[in-house]
Amino acid sequence: MQGIVVIKCGGSTMDQLPDSFFQAIAGLQAQGQEIVIVHGGGPAINSMLDRVQITPQFVDGLRVTCEDTLRVVEMVLCGSINKALVKRLTQAGAKAWGVSGIDGQTLLATKTPKPLGWVGEIKKADMTIPKAILEQGFVPVIAPLSVSEDGTETYNVNADVAAGAIAAALSAEKLIMVTDVPGIMQPQPDGTKAVVSATSAEEIQEMIREEIITGGMIPKVQAALDALGQGVEQVVICRGTAEDLLGVCAGQAVGTTVRMNVNYA
């Protein structure tokens, strides 16, 4: 059987994902491919925060989470977003099971020292529950919330970071980060932008310094590098289409492929 594939679905892509994307997942599952989905929910969270008159704040692409924001994040991620994804997968013919990083202390975290409020730094990703779900023939759909070791505190975790930690803990073959852009975009001499088809850890650090990679793409590539450093073979940043997903799983050159080192020879 092929190695595990972890798919991270960005919040900005959620409403744009076509039925064919979920049908592709169902098809892969039917072929024996083990798939784990980790999802965000940024726009839906921002919409709910707006309704309760809380202004969203971000630092380097990471959400600042006060106690009131945390309650909204938990409600939106574990409630509406997680179950909406499970429903869409079910409608497409897949078998899916929704959980969060809180369940079974799947994502064990401590509060970050950074000025981000109730945001956690993952100390351990326990894959007991996701593996049990996979063994039963389901796709685990994981909301990126985490819990303290004593179970008393809940922390928000950036979905890219959570996906990277989960992929590493599962020794996944691929981590696919689905976004609303076709990959890392690099400015060209004629003023246009082109997709970076392949890149390395060193090149990514250079693109961050040169501000080619900015905003929400920063935690994506940092999570990618963390996952690669912990044994994940390949990270791909691509669009949420059936064609891109199936292409990546088939080993085709799609989006931006990130490896620790890239041989251009």
From Swiss-Prot:
Which pathway does the record list? Amino-acid biosynthesis; L-arginine biosynthesis; N(2)-acetyl-L-ornithine from L-glutamate: step 2/4
- GO BP of this protein: arginine biosynthetic process via ornithine; L-arginine biosynthetic process
CDD domains named in the record: AAK_NAGK-like (cd04238)
* InterPro entries referenced in this protein's UniProt entry, alphabetically: AceGlu_kinase-like_sf (IPR036393), AcgluKinase_fam (IPR004662), ArgB (IPR037528), Asp/Glu/Uridylate_kinase (IPR001048), Glu/AcGlu_kinase (IPR001057)
Q: Which residues participate in substrate binding? A: G41, G42, R63, N156
Q: Which GO cellular component terms are attached?
A: cytoplasm
Task: Name its cellular compartments.
Answer: Cytoplasm
Q: What is its EC number?
A: 2.7.2.8
Q: Which reaction does it catalyse?
A: N-acetyl-L-glutamate + ATP = N-acetyl-L-glutamyl 5-phosphate + ADP
User: Does the record carry Nucleotidyltransferase as a key word?
Assistant: no
**Site Transition state stabilizer: which residues?**
K8, K220
Which GO terms label this protein's molecular function in UniProt? Answer: acetylglutamate kinase activity; ATP binding
NCBIfam families noted in UniProt: argB
Which family does this protein fall into? Answer: Belongs to the acetylglutamate kinase family. ArgB subfamily.
What this chain does, per the entry, is described as: Catalyzes the ATP-dependent phosphorylation of N-acetyl-L-glutamate.
Protein name stated in the entry: Acetylglutamate kinase
Origin species = Brevibacillus brevis (strain 47 / JCM 6285 / NBRC 100599)
